[in-house]
């Protein structure tokens, strides 16, 4: 995740689009994606990508229930990502030695996650909850925690987030919008990935 630095958040309405989308991302130099459980096609999409595109690392996103977490891991997801912090999901994933990246937006939630032994967290919704100012402020007391900011991250501001020392990767939908996927604009997605990779600040 840190090497790529970009985690596209994708919403797939038809599992038929999963593999072409994954190939478009890979062609653009992005080998990781967060497939959200916002549609009925999520589980099958994860299965198809992990089966047919082994170079793509798939995270399951918008995981709200333990049942979704179980389905996601069974489908081949390498990590469970949730918009908020859910003890049941976190505890179950940790018992299964499965990577879990819960969402946080306050210092109290970060401290709770650290107490559980987590060091990589999703900061959501980033822009609405203080954005870069929050991440700079939280770095003092939680120097070992790395964040994946999501929510309001765009082509215009992702580089500012990526420059922060406590950001492991930036996440958003600007690389492949719902419209891009619906219209099967695979070339546009590839070009968006290449452009963002060129602009990504490498240390």
Regions inferred by a protein language model and the residue ranges of each:
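N-terminal amphipathic alpha-helix/helix-capping segment at the start of soluble metabolic enzymes
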Residues: 1-11, 20
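Conserved, mostly hydrophobic/aromatic
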Residues: 8, 25, 72, 121, ...
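Catalytic beta/alpha-barrel core
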Residues: 9-11, 31-39, 56-64, 69, ...
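Catalytic cores of alpha/beta
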Residues: 21, 65-75, 108-116, 153-169
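Glycine-rich, proline-tolerant flexible connector loops at the mouths of alpha/beta enzymes
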Residues: 26, 30-53, 174-184
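Glycine-enriched alpha-helix->loop->beta-strand junction motifs that scaffold or abut catalytic
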Residues: 26-31, 52-56, 73-80, 94-101, ...
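Glycine-rich phosphate-binding active-site loops on the catalytic face of alpha/beta enzymes
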Residues: 83-89, 122-132, 166-188
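C-terminal helical cap(s) of enzyme catalytic domains, especially alpha/beta-barrels
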Residues: 93-98, 179-203
């Amino acid at each position: 995740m840190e090497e790529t630095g970009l985690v596209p958040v994708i919403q797939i309405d038809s599992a038929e689009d999963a593999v072409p989308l994954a190939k478009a991302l890979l062609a653009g130099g992005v080998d990781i994606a967060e497939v959200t459980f916002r549609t009925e096609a999520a589980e099958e999409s994860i299965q198809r990508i992990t089966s047919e595109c082994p170079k793509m690392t798939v995270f399951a996103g918008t995981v709200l229930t333990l049942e979704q977490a179980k389905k996601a891991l069974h489908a081949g997801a390498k990590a469970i990502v949730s918009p908020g912090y859910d003890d049941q999901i976190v505890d179950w994933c940790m018992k299964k030695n499965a990577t879990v990246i819960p969402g946080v937006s306050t210092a109290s939630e970060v401290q709770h996650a650290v107490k559980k032994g987590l060091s990589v967290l999703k900061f959501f919704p980033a822009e609405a909850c203080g954005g870069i100012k929050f991440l700079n402020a939280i770095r003092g007391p939680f120097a070992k925690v790395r964040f994946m900011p999501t929510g309001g991250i765009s082509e215009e501001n992702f580089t500012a987030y990526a420059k922060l020392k406590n950001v492991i990767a930036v996440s958003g939908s600007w690389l492949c919008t719902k419209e891009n996927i619906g219209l099967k604009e695979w070339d546009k997605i590839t070009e968006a990935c290449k452009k963002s990779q060129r602009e990504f600040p490498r240390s």
